[in-house]
């Protein structure tokens, strides 16, 4: 759940991030309002969620959804770097509780706390966290949702998976098995 990211940001006391562009969007149908100025500053959980959700097809990223994905990855990188600072170890119980409330798992709270403590005490380093984007082909479509809001159609960005490259990614980055997946 993306909402957990905002809750963790608030528990951290905010995340310093360079918002790459002005972000304005209003969608009363979804009760979604985004109003973020470009620049480096401390983001609250709500600010972070606005930055992560922004995609406005008409006024959004030049490279569509791929631009949004790059911003999301840059934000999560900044968040992990700041989260793992030793001063945040005092907030470990709060982080574990947010995780427990938002992630479906059979781990006990004790298990979650054990993994969190291991991460904070050197088991996880920001330079070892890698984000990858699903291999894809960009696609565009006209949205009728936007037409209801402002009386016109708007081009929306989407991606479609490239299955052969996706299998290669699974085999080289994600699979713990020696066996190669072929389908």
Labelled PLM ranges:
Residues 104-183:
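C-terminal solvent-exposed extensions
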Residues 1-4:
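Short helix-initiation/N-cap motifs at beta->coil->alpha
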Residues 6-94, 98, 177:
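Flexible, polar/acidic helix-loop-strand segments at domain edges
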């Amino acid at each position: 759940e993306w909402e957990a990211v905002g809750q963790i940001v608030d528990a951290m006391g905010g995340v310093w991030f360079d918002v790459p562009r002005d972000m304005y969007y209003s969608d009363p149908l979804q009760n979604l309002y985004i109003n973020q100025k470009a620049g480096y500053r401390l983001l609250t959980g709500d600010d972070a969620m606005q930055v992560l959700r922004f995609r406005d097809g008409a006024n959004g990223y030049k490279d569509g959804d791929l631009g949004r994905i790059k911003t999301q990855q840059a934000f999560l990188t900044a968040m992990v770097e700041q989260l793992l600072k030793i001063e945040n170890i005092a907030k470990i119980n709060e982080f574990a509780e947010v995780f427990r409330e938002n992630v479906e798992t059979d781990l006990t709270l004790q298990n979650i706390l054990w993994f969190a403590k291991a991460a904070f005490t050197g088991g996880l380093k920001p330079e070892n966290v890698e984000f990858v984007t699903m291999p894809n082909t960009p696609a565009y479509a006209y949205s009728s949702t936007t037409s209801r809001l402002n009386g016109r159609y708007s081009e929306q960005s989407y991606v479609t998976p490239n299955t052969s490259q996706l299998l290669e990614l699974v085999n080289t980055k994600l699979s713990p098995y020696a066996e190669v997946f072929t389908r």
